[in-house]
Amino acid sequence: MKNQMNLQFSALSQNESFARVTVASFITQLDPTMDELTEIKTVVSEAVTNAIIHGYESNSDGVVYISVTLHEDGVVELMIRDEGIGIDNVDEAKQPLYTTKPDLERSGMGFTIMENFMDEIRVESTVLEGTTLYLKKHLTNSKALCN
């Protein structure tokens, strides 16, 4: 059995904390460790911030989409998507310290953080169509989902 949640919200920076807390609340039913929960919250924060700042270039007309799937074996799958400007070169964007917004004091560590905290990460992006992140984490001692 699996459990799924879908969420969409305006691409406003104040909605980043809403997304982070909502995803964390949903995941708690698997009883993750505090470290695992913190890592997932950080990843959601980084991904949503990237969508808002880079994908939509802070244009609040955009929408961020999140899907969370919890599997009975303790696997958490996240899909975070925007319909923004896309990433021209994903490999370059994933390099530590790479940023397209140095004037906004961006550290360029978002993808590096996501790769370190998740077991799997896949990025699909098309210029002028948007970016989708697929992320997966295996929780260590999670509870089975209730039937």
Curated annotation (Swiss-Prot):
Any GO MF annotation of the entry: sigma factor antagonist activity
EC number: 2.7.11.1
Database matches in InterPro entries: Anti-sigma-factor_SerPK, Anti-sigma_F, HATPase_C_sf
Keywords linked to the UniProt accession: ATP-binding, Kinase, Nucleotide-binding, Serine/threonine-protein kinase, Sporulation, Transferase
Keyword Disulfide bond: no
Pfam families, sorted: HATPase_c_2
KW Kinase (keyword) present: yes
Alphabetical list of Gene3D superfamilies matching this protein: Histidine kinase-like ATPase, C-terminal domain
Reaction it catalyzes: L-seryl-[protein] + ATP = O-phospho-L-seryl-[protein] + ADP + H(+); L-threonyl-[protein] + ATP = O-phospho-L-threonyl-[protein] + ADP + H(+)
GO aspect biological process, one term: sporulation resulting in formation of a cellular spore
Function: Binds to sigma F and blocks its ability to form an RNA polymerase holoenzyme (E-sigma F). Phosphorylates SpoIIAA on a serine residue. This phosphorylation may enable SpoIIAA to act as an anti-anti-sigma factor that counteracts SpoIIAB and thus releases sigma F from inhibition.
HAMAP family associated with the record: Anti_sigma_F
Family: Belongs to the anti-sigma-factor family.
Name of the featured protein: Anti-sigma F factor
Lineage of producing organism: Bacteria, Bacillati, Bacillota, Bacilli, Bacillales
